[in-house]
Every structure is written in structure tokens, then in C-alpha cells.
Amino acid sequence: MKKWKIAVRIAAFLGCAALLLYGLTVFLKDKRVTFDYDTTRKVEGFYAEEKDSLDFVFVGSSQMFTSVVPAVLWEEYGITSYDFGANEQPMYLSYYYIKEALKYQDPKAIVLEVSYCNAPEYTHEGVHHINLDDLRMGPVKLEAIFDIIPEGERFPYIFELAKYHDTWTTMDKASFQYIGADKHNPYKGYTPSLDGFADGGEFNEEIAKVTEKAELAELSVKYMEKIIALCKEKNVDLLFLKTPNDHIQNQPEYNAVADIAATHDIPYLDLNREMKGQLHNHVFHAETITKRIGEWLTSLYEVEDKRENPEFAQWHEDADYYYRYAHQLRLNGIEIFEEYMAELIGKDYIVCIAVNQDAGAYLSEEAVALMQQLGCQWDVSTAGGNSYLAVVENGIIHAETGSEDVVAYENRIYDHTFKVVSQGSQAGCNASIIIDGVEYAPNEKGFNIVVYDPKLDMILSTNSFEITES
């Protein structure tokens, strides 16, 4: 009986120690959770997707997950997809990502982005940690570690606390908040980029003329062949994709991929031959790229349009996150007051307006009408140099007032404290819009506007417009 009790105590002790070790690892492990470096959200978000719910899984490097926007595939075609990849991912790591993906999803096809089709050797430790750390510990991850990582360097990949034991000294607020957060990723692995041209720039026709074919590195070919064999074994289609990057010097490599695709009867879309691109494509150009990919996929497969399927209602919510983010970029690129107002009408944002010096004696009739559609009731064009402020939300007025004197508003909305102050030409010439103690107003002459999105819980836009006599 004594031996039994001792065994139970030892087992309980070991169990508690294991739980403590796991908890410390989760707490201290490096968390890559903010744009443009959000591999942790990307990988853990994949595991949060409902099993066998994805039509397509995209695998590859940052050139893939900054160019393929799952929200656009959903919005345009009703296709469910996910960008399951990590920074600088070579073929030998893509192989293990595909192997891991097929444990959880049974897609119509794996879409392999081939930018890193010519890695001549195993890359450096940093890339290995970025790609391996966030995969779930299990047979696939262990196989990858023992296959890729040299003997003598594997310990911190298996027992991650050995590498990250002192990261508590450098953890930021986002990392702390992520520990207990829902791991669902509404962006479906996509990472927005603001690099390069919003329209992609001018297409380099010289790329389409390149016919040379490189001899790909043996290591890359080996793992591409393993990927092909794996997909055949799992009875899932494999597609090759090259997102546009305008790297004419690498086009012979992408041409060589075409030979591999032809040998194995694998559909291959090389967008370098169709459109301009960058290393990381701008959000708006990524939309164009994704629409082209959607055309390609729907030409190859009959895919159920799930937009009206109530079982996929969450996909509408998730896509909305992306389109709100994209709307932020569009707002911040607008320089005309009327266009800016028009973009805000009908949106469930909180719009804070504070006038500095001049309340809009030269406002056009169109501008006044747009402000009234937004929810403002005053005809601000008659206010001259008076102070004026407004706080409106999708047609609902939280506050609107004007005077020759200083006007101010303070209240809590959505658990945030909003404080708005306007001082017209007779009251000191100042504009202030403070949210949770942080000043966001540009405090320029004219209309100072701050837009808060309660769904994204973020400041969407800050802008100012001086209305002058035309």
C-alpha cells in the first residue's frame, strides 16, 4: 500500500512539474503577434480553424502571405482558404507545413507558392525558429527537427524554455495580451503590407521574355518531390503558384519550376509573367493578385459558393476585419474633405470632429449635406470662426455643439474615454481629441477628425482639412 501511495505522489509531482513547465513555456516563448511579423498568430490561427473546413491551403513564405488575401477569395467567390506559412520558408520547411496542414484539413488542393524554390542549403537558426516554434509539438514537428536541425542544436527546439527562459524582460503588451486571447485569426494568415505601389506599378514585359531555365538546387528539388509524393499519398491535389515579385534575375528558377509542374501534371500559375509585383505586395495590389488567383482556382475546380451557407456565417465576420483594415488605408489616402465624409457615411465608426480656428465658412453645399448624412445636424457653414465639435456613430449623435467660447465633451464609449475640445478663432484656436489619455488630433487649422473603429478596437484614421475659399 505504501509503494502505491509513493507511486501516486511521484506521478502527481511529475504531472504538476510538466504542467508548470508547459505553462512557463507558453508564457515565455517568443510571440510574433503584430503586423508585419505575426507568424505566431498565423500558425496558431490555422489550428483554430474548424476541421476540414478549408477549400484551399496556401503554403509558403512571406511572398505568399502578403499577396494572397483569403478575405477577397471569400468575398468574391465564397471560397474558404488560409495562408499557412512563415517568413523565408524554403521548400524543406514547406514540406512539413503541408504535412501538418493535412492532419487538420482535407482541402481540394494545397497551393504551394514557389518563391523559395532554389534554397541550396539549410538556412540559419533564426528562420528555423520562426518556422518551427509555433507548430504544435507532435510527430510532424519532431520529424522536422530531427531532419533539419543538426545534432547538438535540437534541444531548444524541443524544450523551448531553454531558448526563451529570459524573454520576460523584453515582452511587450501585445505579447502579454496574446497569452490568454482567442487564437482565431480573422485575417486567415494574411499579413497586410504597405510596401511598393498600391496598383502594383508598371508591368515589366521583359520578364515574360525570359526563357532560360536554372538548374535548381538539389535540396529544393528533393523536397519538392517529397511534397508531390506526400500530396499523392494523401490524395489531395497540388498546385504551384508564383506571386508577382518582378525579380527578373530569378525568373529562370521559376521557369524551371514549370518543368517540374509539367512532368507531374501540376497546374502552375506564374503571375510574374502577367503583372507587376514587389517582394511584399501592397494591400491593394494583393487584392488584384488574389482576384486573379480566384479566377484560376475556379477554372480548375467547381467550388461551392459558401457565402449563403449559414454554417460559414463566421467567414463574413472575419472578412469584415480585413475590409475594415483596408478601408483605413483608403481613408488615410484621401485629401479632399467631401470624399472623406462620403467614405464615413453608413459605417459603424465613432467619428470625432473638433474645429481649430475656423468652423467652415467656405464649406460647400455638398460638404454640408454629407456631414448631415453622417449624423451632424448643424449647418456648420454658418458658424464662421466659432468653436465646433461633434461625436457621431453611424448616424447617432453622441455630442454636437458650437459656440464663440471653448466647447468640450467628455464621456465613456465602448469602455474608452473620449475627450474632445474645440477652440474657434475667438476662443484660442485649438483642437484636441483625446482617447484614453492619448492625443490624436492633428491640431491643424480647420476640421480635425479622428475615426475610431469599435470592432477592430483601434484608431482607424486621423486627418485635418482646412476649408478655404475656392
Q: Model regions: which residues?
A:
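Membrane-embedded segments
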Residues: 59, 63-145
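C-terminal regions of proteins
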Residues: 252-323
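Alpha-helical transmembrane signal-anchor/signal-peptide segments
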Residues: 28-49
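Secreted/periplasmic serine-hydrolase-like ester/acetyl group-modifying domain
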Residues: 127-234, 306-327
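Short acidic-hydrophobic catalytic motif
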Residues: 327-470
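Acidic-and-aromatic substrate-binding clefts and catalytic sites of carbohydrate-active enzymes
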Residues: 88-92, 216-218, 245-252, 360
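Hydrophobic membrane-insertion alpha-helices, especially the h-region
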Residues: 5-26
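Short hydrophobic beta-strand that contains or immediately precedes a catalytic carboxylate
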Residues: 56-60, 281
